[in-house]
Amino acid sequence: SKNTPIEHMKTFYTDFDKMRGEKYDGMIITGAPVEQMDFEEVTYWDEITEIFDWARTHVTSTLYICWAAQAGLYHHYGVPKYALDKKMFGIFEHRTLQPLHPIFRGFDDMFYVPHSRHTEVRREDIQKVPELTLLSESEDAGVYMAVARGGREFFVTCLLYTSDAAD
């Protein structure tokens, strides 16, 4: 990691081979600065998809965030990503499409989410997959959250950015 001290990495992280035989309640798979590349061009595509597949049998609930959400939707369900004409950047109003879903307990029907991304997945592609349920979207920012496998897989678009993310 270029921003995290090596001692922190050694203390709080492990490699996949040491985890293989274990079961976990939850896993978060997050983004990477590779969203403008085709998935198969990513150097570690084979390794990350192996982890995606492993999580289905060893993890109760998996949260795919940002690039990992697009990658997981593509790998598991064939949902493509699309390049945006210009980078989406800002805070956008979103609505809940399944307001009684437990993940929205305590949420208002409308809520705001920051986005910073060059690519998107589209509502119509998610709706073509019977196993996927669209949970939230924005008129301006598009798809925000989808769920599959009875709430065991959540896919959430990029919801954060740093002060230099507009670059």
Language-model segments: residues:
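Short, well-ordered beta-to-alpha junction loops that form the rim of enzyme active sites
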Residues: 67, 158-159
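Conserved small/polar residues in nucleotide/adenosyl-binding loops
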Residues: 161-165
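Catalytic beta-strand/loop cores that center a nucleophilic Ser/Cys/Thr
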Residues: 105-153, 158
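N-terminal beta1-alpha1 cap of cysteine-dependent amidohydrolase-like domains
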Residues: 1-40, 47, 167
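A polyampholytic, Gly/Pro-enriched intrinsically disordered region
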Residues: 13-16, 73, 112
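Short helix-loop capping/hinge motifs at secondary-structure junctions, enriched
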Residues: 100-104
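Cysteine-nucleophile active-site neighborhood
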Residues: 29-98
